[in-house]
Amino acid sequence: MKVSVIIPTYNERENLEELFSRIDNALQGLNYEIVVVDDDSPDRTWEKAQELSSKYPVKVIRRTKEKGLSSAVIRGFKEASGDVFVVMDADLQHPPEVIPKLIEAIKNGSDIAIGSRYVKGGKVENWPFYRKLISKGAIMVGRIALPKIRDIKDPVSGFFALRKEVVEGVELNPIGFKILMEILIKGKYSKVVEVPFTFGIRARGESKLKGKTIFEYLRHIYRLMKWEGEIDRIVKFSIVGLSGILVNEGFLWLFVNLGIPKEIAVIPAVELSILNNFFWNDIWTFKDIRRGSIFSRLLKFHIAALSGAVVNFIVYWILLFLGIHYLIANLVGIVLSFGVRYVINRHVTWAT
């Protein structure tokens, strides 16, 4: 088995000698290569990598037109000759000493082995609070928006290994830095394992984190949601929800005109609208991912509806207390309630 260590670089010249030495020590006895994909660094990182190729098994690709970490990794996949690909940064925050553990996980039957900061035994060194908040928030958004990765603790890790078959013939076109998330959604695999590691302190050079990174990440999630069909589901769920409003209002009018008191008539009207919404979501919105009995799904759907109503009520009263107009307060509550109901239904009622 041959291992290809793929390293996208930009202005990492000062780190290469230590990085290559540590990789070499970690992979003693293994057939491996280092594939450096450099975006024409002003500090001539590519040149330093070429110098070190006399000492280590290094293949250097200098890109003068393309830019970006994710596309550099994809180029590395195409140029690599190994059976297993390892992706890592050049800034020494990904410890090369963990690579053998990733490779061992692949040997033991995993298709993808993720170096994880957020499983037991993993951690991040000396990050300020705002960085931790951004990282955890990004992961939470991704896991909610993309059900396929909801059980993965660190789907945005930049340190991972995979069998080459996972990405062979797969069209990858990520936005920004999070190539792993693209692979987890589009790749060909059945088993993923997370290996804990300590995300270290940057040795030298400057962080690549910029303000636009968050925007690119959200664009990437949106694109993956479209690819997965999640945007279509949300649209269908919204249409069904609107039909439920019509059913609710129509039956409320009917029951009141039949002489049922308004205070009582609202109860069967709400229940009929819930049944309407469940029926259409079950045969239309989520028809391809139905699991378990219809009675189990119906019970979970009622729980989601109740949860949404509670959120609507709480948000409404909080905003009223803050002096927000009651119609605006109610609208905000409805929107947040919709989000809660969709998330619960997608991840619980019609979980995949």
UniProtKB/Swiss-Prot annotation:
Q: Which cofactors go with this protein? A: Mg(2+); Mn(2+); Ca(2+)
- What detail does the entry give on cofactor binding? Binds 1 divalent metal cation.
Q: Which residues cross the membrane?
A: 230-256, 262-286, 294-320, 326-350
Q: Name one Pfam family in it.
A: Glycos_transf_2
Annotated membrane topology is: Multi-pass membrane protein
Q: What class of enzyme is it?
A: transferase
Q: Where in the cell is it found?
A: Cell membrane
Which reaction is this enzyme known to catalyze?
a di-trans,poly-cis-dolichyl phosphate + GDP-alpha-D-mannose = a di-trans,poly-cis-dolichyl beta-D-mannosyl phosphate + GDP
What cellular component terms from Gene Ontology apply here? plasma membrane
Binding residues annotated for GDP-alpha-D-mannose, in chain numbering: 8, 10, 12, 37, 39, 89-91, 93, 117, 156, 178, 202, 208
Q: Where does Mn(2+) bind?
A: 91, 93
Could you tell me which cysteines form disulfide bridges?
Answer: none
Which regions of this chain are Extracellular-facing, per the record's topological domains? 257-261, 321-325
Query: GO terms for biological process?
Result: dolichol phosphate mannose biosynthetic process; dolichol-linked oligosaccharide biosynthetic process; GPI anchor biosynthetic process; polysaccharide biosynthetic process; protein O-linked mannosylation
Keyword terms: Cell membrane, Glycosyltransferase, Magnesium, Manganese, Membrane, Metal-binding, Transferase, Transmembrane, Transmembrane helix
Q: Does the keyword tRNA-binding apply?
A: no
In terms of superkingdom, the source organism counts as Archaea
Record topology, Cytoplasmic segments = 1-229, 287-293, 351-352
Q: Which residues bind Mg(2+)?
A: 91, 93
Changing residue 93 to A has the effect of: Decreases enzyme activity
One GO molecular function term of this record is: dolichyl-phosphate beta-D-mannosyltransferase activity
Q: In which pathway does it act?
A: Protein modification; protein glycosylation
Described by its record, this protein's role is as follows:
Transfers mannose from GDP-mannose to dolichol monophosphate to form dolichol phosphate mannose (Dol-P-Man) which is the mannosyl donor in pathways leading to N-glycosylation, glycosyl phosphatidylinositol membrane anchoring, and O-mannosylation of proteins.
Sorted alphabetically, which PANTHER family does this protein's record hold? DOLICHOL-PHOSPHATE MANNOSYLTRANSFERASE SUBUNIT 1 (PTHR43398:SF1)
Q: What is this protein called?
A: Dolichol-phosphate mannosyltransferase
Identify the species of origin. Pyrococcus furiosus (strain ATCC 43587 / DSM 3638 / JCM 8422 / Vc1)
